[in-house]
Amino acid sequence: VTSITLNLANPTAGQYSSFVDKIRNNVRDP
């Protein structure tokens, strides 16, 4: 849980891009 929190608090560019892509996919295909 701690590592996940740290990743959310300090996401790398790659992690952020992947996160955004997942959201966009969810919006397109709910």
Curated annotation (Swiss-Prot):
Protein name: rRNA N-glycosylase
GO BP: any one term: negative regulation of translation
Provenance organism: Saponaria ocymoides (Rock soapwort)
E.C. numbers: 3.2.2.22
Domain of life: Eukaryota
Family assignment from sequence similarity: Belongs to the ribosome-inactivating protein family. Type 1 RIP subfamily.
GO MF term list: rRNA N-glycosylase activity; toxin activity
Function description: Exhibits N-glycosylase activity. Catalyzes the release of one adenine from a ribosome. Acts as a ribosome-inactivating protein and inhibits protein synthesis in a rabbit-reticulocyte lysate system and in various cell lines (in vitro).
